[in-house]
Amino acid sequence: AVDLAAGRGSVQTLEGRNRAVGGSGLAALLFEAFGSVERPWDDPGQPLIFAIGPLTGYFPLMSKTVCAFKSPYHDQYAESHAGGRSALALRFADLDALVVTGRAPTPSCLAVGSHHIELQDVHYLWGQDVYATGRMLRRMYPGAGHRSILRIGPAGEIGSAMAGINVDTYRHFGRLGGGGVMGAKNLKGIVIEGDAAFSLPADKVIPAP
């Protein structure tokens, strides 16, 4: 979990993890732990959650990430799904989920990997669209093929209930205003760096047909 206001994060083990089914179940469990149904969607304490299921990286086509938050559209719990590299980047960062709380003091980019968390001031990107932002973040965070870059445009910056989160240029968390939630946290971008390795369990290898 990352606290943007404090500028620090930690790796935590979630009690009850095994009773949650898939990325959607994990995201809901994390919102129960970190979120509040009483507070408004743009309260800094409300979490922005990115979660994957147990088969990601182990079984073909399990490549979606679940983004969960309290929606600016109807002020209720919501989730949106996206493809791209985000799910595998989380897996290779040795994370089942990323939980972001708080509000950064300046427009910022959050970078996370298997051994690091970094929050960088990117005020100069505020106002840029997702394409210009993506080009700049790719230069700032090399490692094509191993990292996933999530970012918002001007609609997200103003908290629009229709703003999505762009993922690796061609994919989107497109439903229910996740981009507005990022903007409310002063978060212009998130870079997930899949910089670790994991091995398949020997007794779980799936033979080719």
Task: Tell where the protein language model's regions lie, with residue ranges.
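Intrinsically disordered, low-complexity segments enriched in small residues
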Residues: 1-81, 85-209
